[in-house]
From Swiss-Prot:
Annotated organism of origin: Escherichia phage T5 (Enterobacteria phage T5)
Designated gene of the protein: D18-19
GO cellular component: virus tail
EC number of this enzyme: 4.2.2.n1
Site feature Cleavage, where: 1127-1128
Residue ranges the record marks as coiled coil: 441-519, 838-941, 1003-1032
Quaternary structure, from the entry: Homotrimer.
Entry protein name: Tape measure protein pb2 precursor
Length: 1219
């Protein structure tokens, strides 16, 4: 049809002169021819497929024949041989399938490429034809009617070509169009389609096998978290159905049940319910089990109605509530109070009970039919095969053997291996999983060992029966032969022997399988035990350990041992905790709703009490932290103590709120008791109110404790507010009675107080006046309260208020007057005190006056006039004190400057840059004068002073302040002093060497003695010059250090004292007598000196010192008995430790590195002169005696300093002399 349309269109177009369009149509025809060629190639490839498919068919036939040859009567050997044959055929089948797959892949690739090329060519040609026709139509649209016919034909061609493109995309219609010329092509296509379907089914089977593998992995992961692998649940479910469902379906159902929280025991009950329904109603076992699990978990009664189990939810809930209330926990449950988990359990219990009630009589007869077991086993084998093929890990034969003959033992091994895998990956902190895994492994092993004993016993019985039968045959063999020869009898005994032999062989095979399974189960126990031992605290609580044999070698893991009873007990405790954890949301909800009713409060208290006990028990037996367990419950508590406090609060709340009848009875009894004693109704009511208030206060305390658990609970807030309102109402009843009595006796009580005030003789007039006014104010306030309760007392209330205001004003004026008198008396008391203490110092007088004024200001707060008065006095006194301070500073600066002969201009009154500039001028003038005075003493000192000046000038340029400059200059000068000392030591050492050489050469002649004397004199001069230089430098350093020791100008006296001490030392060093005596070089060297004995007399008229005892003992030191200063014996010095040093005073040295101090008397070993004794250079500064001499020569300066100090304290030397 397509070819015909194309030819007609081509002729029509050529007749009408559309050349380009005709060419496009020819291209379309060429493309279709190419498509036909591609189809022929496809046919050729498909033609090769029947031979391969025929080979597959023959292999399948041979496999089927091998399967038909399997006969149970031939025993296990025949079965094994048949299985071997199946394995060979399956190997060949696998090879043929691979070849088919390769050829199909090649063929389909060619077909795909050809069809794709054909479609592309047709589509391209069609688009080109359509474009050309559109162009032709636009060009010839307005010429003639013939062209209109061309347009119509072009439209039909376009539709025909569209149909051609659609046909090219559909392979079925293309092949159908070619059927007339294809020959065997349709048959080949059918064969190809069927094989493609087979392959697709095979791929789907492999996909299902992979899904099963993932399902088993999921089961292992779930076992890691819950302690019970899904494989174990599936095995329990399969056993409950007597093998009526496959292991695959059991795995699926077990996974679903595990997600809903059902355990293995419940799954067994569900399996029994499904089995009953399947047997009675004739439904499929898998569908029945699926309905039971989903119906119970989702509480969908429609699913179970179809299984003959009809239940009303309300009935199930009511029956479960009755069971809960029968446990005598003190909690009254209702249907509305049941949690989601409890409702699920209620429905599950009712389903099991209803199934047992209706179909329980069939339990003994229930057994899976052979066809059901065969279907389940075949399905399990198929699924196992699919799993094995999906993994590509094991040979095909081993995989088939494993899954075609899968027994209970092999399933147990799978379950045990899954448990071992779960145990190895279970975290040590997951106590639940560790315990459940260990308990499950132990129970599986014990159960299996018990079954194995029964199997062994049965095998022994079979063997004994077979031995007896053989013995019997041996005894009756002659008779049997005779009967057989005569045609009487048969071989029934032989058949029985064969049957028993096969059965015994099967039992032995099963025992062998069980031996393997037992090994795996024991390994599971070992693995779960090792996992449990990873949690040291849990293992310690359980007493679990590894037991090693006496002949154990290094690396032996030992055998896991634990008391099964302990393990089971811990498991139960952990299960209880896990159950509470699952229902923690319900417990939290009960706690939140505790304030809504006393029933909810009781339930919350009971739940929380159970939780506390469970946490304590779990923490005790597992070693887990109680606080961590509490946090895991997610009840809003962070520690066990907090939970206990909440439980105590709930318990007290229940106790306080659940005795309303008892409280009412107690109030009534108290009221009756007091009335019988006093016959006073008011007292009886008051006593009853006291009891009621106590009860209400207890309830309020309990309600607040409950509110502390749930601070934002609206019900608890309402409860607290309600009780507080009741307390206030109860108190208000007492207030009404008290007011009546007070109103009656008010006037009399006021009179009594006035009389008592008049009789008080201890108060002054001012105090009495204030007390009287305060009493009047109090009485007026009471009158106001009294009048306000009267219907016609409003006018009296206003009068009383005005009287209160007037009295308050009078009280304020009286208090102000009394305060003013008291405050003014303070200044009078100060003047008296100063006169008594003979205070004459102006500074002290002003300071004390300022302190009293501040006290007066503090006491006068609230009185504006007095505050202004005392603030003004404080300001004046402070100004006078500051002026006195400035004047005295100026006087001190002038006096100090004149005493030391300094050029100094006072800076009093100057501030800011003016004062800084004046201070700089004073410093420079003092420095110039000091340098000029030092230059008068020695020319070398002048040079040193000039060097110091240059160094100072350089340091000033880089320092940040005058004190920093002074410190840097002092450091530089100390460096110069060290250099001078080193140079002097070198010169003295050279002269000592010259003296030693001269003594060695001659030393006896006059010329030699004269030369030695000259050398000694030269050495003495060098030492004297060096000493003077050192004194000058050290004095300058001391002055600079004194300048930085305390703030200026208080450092001036220290600087002056340092300068004077240096001057005295320089004067002493300038004289020859001031140096240590050196023996004449011409005389014999004196080896020792006799200095006399140490006196034992102590002048008791002088002040005692700590050195007197050391002096009398003969310790080393300096001074006499009254001024003795002990000295150290030398020793090691360590970083960070301070040591006392010095000859004439205490110096503290803190070395930063390890040092050693050597006494002076030990220096002779290392530095001896020619005379054999050390040269000691004594430089005397201002000691006690020198200071006394200095004080005697400069008494005027000291007198002025003392006079100034006394003037600051308000006295004079003259006044002291008069006193």
């Amino acid at each position: 049809m397509t070819d015909k349309l194309i030819r007609e269109l081509l002729i029509d177009v050529k007749q009408k002169g559309a050349t380009r369009t005709a060419k496009s149509i020819e291209n379309v025809s060429d493309a279709l021819e190419n498509a036909a060629a591609a189809s022929e190639l496809t046919n050729e490839q498909l033609g090769k497929m029947p031979r391969t498919l025929y080979s597959i068919e023959r292999a399948a036939d041979r496999a089927a024949k091998s399967l038909t040859k399997m006969q149970a009567s031939r025993g296990m050997a025949g079965i094994t041989k048949s299985i071997d044959g199946i394995g060979d055929k399956l190997d060949y089948l696998a090879i043929q399938l691979i070849e088919v797959t390769d050829k199909l892949e090649i063929g389909f690739d060619g077909v795909s490429r050809s069809v794709k090329a054909m479609g592309n060519d047709v589509a391209a040609a069609t688009e080109k034809v359509q474009d050309r026709l559109y162009d032709t139509n636009r060009a010839l649209g307005g010429t003639s009617k013939g062209f209109n016919d061309t347009a119509g034909a072009a439209g039909r061609a376009s539709r025909a070509l569209g149909n051609t493109s659609g046909s090219a995309r559909g392979a079925t219609r293309d092949f159908a169009a070619m059927a007339k010329i294809g020959g065997r092509l349709p048959i080949m296509y059918a064969a190809l389609a069927s094989n493609v379907f087979v392959l697709q089914t095979a791929f789907e089977s492999l996909k299902v096998g992979d899904q099963l593998n993932r399902l088993e992995q999921f089961g292992t992961i779930v076992g890691t978290m819950t302690g019970t692998p899904v494989q174990t649940l599936a095995l329990s479910l399969q056993n409950a159905t007597n093998g009526a469902i496959s292991f695959e379906e059991a795995m699926r159902q077990a996974s679903s049940a595990s997600a809903y929280g059902f355990d293995s025991e419940q799954l067994e009950q569900f399996g029994l319910v499904a089995r009953r329904a399947a047997a009675v109603l004739g439904v499929d076992m898998t569908d029945a089990l699926n309905r039971v699990i989903k119906g119970v978990s989702k509480q969908e009664i429609e699913l179970l109605d179809e299984l003959g189990v009809t239940i009303r939810l309300n009935d199930a809930y009511e029956n479960y509530v009755k069971q809960l209330n029968a446990t005598s926990t003190g909690i009254k449950y209702t249907v509305d109070s049941l949690t989601t988990y409890q409702k699920q359990q209620a429905y599950a219990n009712e389903v099991i009970a209803e199934s047992t009630r209706r179909f329980g009589y069939l339990d003994d007869a229930l057994k899976a039919t052979s066809w059901e077991q065969f279907a389940a086993n075949a399905n399990s084998a198929l699924r196992s095969l699919q799993q094995s093929a999906a993994t590509y890990l094991n040979p095909v034969m081993d995989t088939l053997n494993t899954f075609l003959y899968q027994t209970k033992s092999s399933q147990m091994r799978v379950s045990a291996m899954a448990r071992s895998a779960s145990a190895k990956t279970t975290p040590a902190e997951n106590v639940t999983a560790l315990i459940e895994n260990a308990v499950g492994a132990r129970e599986d092993l014990d159960t299996y060992l018990k079954e194995s004993e029964e199997r062994v016993k049965k095998a022994q019985e079979l063997k004994q029966q077979l031995d007896d039968l053989k013995a019997k045959q041996a005894a009756t063999a002659p008779i049997a032969n005779a009967l057989t020869a005569g045609g009487i009898g048969g071989d029934e005994s032989n058949k029985l022997v064969v049957q028993l032999t096969n059965e015994l062989a099967r039992q032995n095979k099963e025992i062998e399988e069980r031996t393997k399974t037992e090994k795996v189960l024991r390994q599971a126990v070992q693995d779960t035990g090792e996992a449990l031992l990873r949690n040291g605290k849990l293992a310690e609580q359980l007493g679990a350990k590894m037991k090693y044999a006496d002949t154990a070698v290094p690396g032996d893991k030992g055998v896991f041992e634990v008391d099964p009873n302990n393990l089971k007990a811990v498991s139960e405790i952990q299960k209880n905790f896990d159950f509470l954890k699952k229902s923690s949301s319900d417990t939290a909800n009960n706690i939140r709703m505790a304030a809504s009713s006393i029933t909810n409060a009781k339930k919350a208290s009971s739940d929380l009490n159970s939780v506390v006990k469970a946490v304590e028990d779990t923490s005790k037996v597992t070693g887990q932290s109680a606080d961590t367990l509490v946090k895991n419950l997610n009840l809003g508590f962070s520690s066990l103590d907090q939970m206990k406090a909440a439980q105590k609060g709930l318990s007290e709340y229940v106790t306080a709120m659940d005795k309303s009848e008892q409280n009412a009875l107690e109030v009534a009894k108290r009221k009756d008791e007091v009335y019988n004693q006093t016959k006073d109704k008011a007292k009886a009511e008051a006593a009853a109110r006291e009891v009621l208030l106590r009860q209400q206060q207890e309830q309020l305390t309990a309600a607040k404790a409950l509110l502390a658990i749930n601070p934002n609970d609206p019900e608890a807030l309402k409860q607290v507010a309600k009780i507080e309102t009741e307390i206030l109402n109860t108190k208000a009843q007492g207030f009404e009675n008290a007011k009546k009595t007070k109103d009656y006796t008010d006037k009399i009580l006021g009179v009594d107080r006035e009389i008592a005030l008049l009789n008080d003789r201890t108060m002054t007039s001012t105090q009495y006046r204030l007390a009287q006014l305060r009493l009047e104010l109090q009485l007026e306030q009471e009158k106001t309260e009294l009048y306000s309760k009267q219907a016609d007392g409003q006018a009296k209330v206003e009068q009383s208020r005005r009287a209160q205001a007037q009295i308050s004003r009078e009280i304020w004026e009286a208090e102000k007057q009394g305060t003013a008198s008291h405050v003014s008396a303070l200044m009078d008391a100060l003047e008296v005190s100063q006169t008594q203490r003979n205070v004459t110092g102006q500074s002290q007088i002003l300071t004390e006056r300022l302190s009293i004024l501040q006290q007066q200001l503090e006491l006068s707060k609230g009185n504006t006039e007095e505050e202004l008065k005392y603030r003004n006095e404080i300001y004046k006194t402070s100004a006078a004190l500051e002026q006195l301070k400035k004047q005295r500073e100026s006087q001190m600066q002038q006096q100090v400057g004149s005493s030391v002969g300094a050029t100094y201009t006072p800076t009093t009154g100057l501030i800011g840059e003016d004062k800084d500039f004046a201070d700089m001028q004073n410093r420079m003038a003092s420095y110039d004068q000091a340098i000029s005075k030092l230059s008068e003493l020695n020319s070398e000192a002048t040079a040193v002073a000039q060097s110091m000046g240059n160094l100072t000038n350089a340091m000033i340029q880089f320092s940040q302040g005058s004190l920093d400059t002074t410190s840097m200059i002092a450091s530089g000068m100390q460096t110069v002093a060290s250099m001078i000392q080193y140079s002097t030591s070198q010169q003295v050492s050279a002269i000592d060497q010259a003296i030693a050489a001269e003594q060695k050469r001659d030393g006896k002649s006059e010329a030699s003695k004269a030369k030695l004397k000259k050398l000694e004199a030269e050495k003495l001069k060098i030492q004297q010059d060096a000493a003077k230089k050192q004194i000058i430098i050290q004095t300058a350093v001391a002055v600079m250090q004194a300048a930085t020791a305390v703030p200026y100008p208080f450092s001036i006296p220290l600087m002056v004292a340092a300068g004077l001490a240096g001057a005295l030392a320089l004067a002493q060093a300038s004289s020859a007598s001031g140096m240590s005596s050196i023996a004449d070089s011409g005389a014999d060297t004196t080896q020792y000196l006799t200095l006399g004995e140490r006196q034992k007399n102590v002048d008791v008229s002088m002040q005692a010192s700590s050195g007197e005892l050391s002096y009398l003992r003969g310790d080393k030191g300096i001074g006499n008995a009254n001024s003795f200063v002990p000295r150290a014996e030398g020793g090691m010095m360590y970083p960070g430790v301070s040591y006392q040093m010095g000859e004439h005073g205490t110096e503290v040295v803190t070395p930063m590195v390890p040092m050693k101090a050597t006494p002076n008397d030990q220096l002779s070993d290392g530095s001896k002169t020619t005379s054999g004794r050390p040269i000691i250079l004594n430089i005397s500064t201002m000691d006690a005696a020198s200071f006394r001499d200095f004080a005697s020569n400069n008494s005027t300066a000291f007198r002025d300093a003392v006079e100034l100090a006394l003037n600051e304290n308000g006295t004079t030397l003259k006044s002291l002399g008069n006193s």
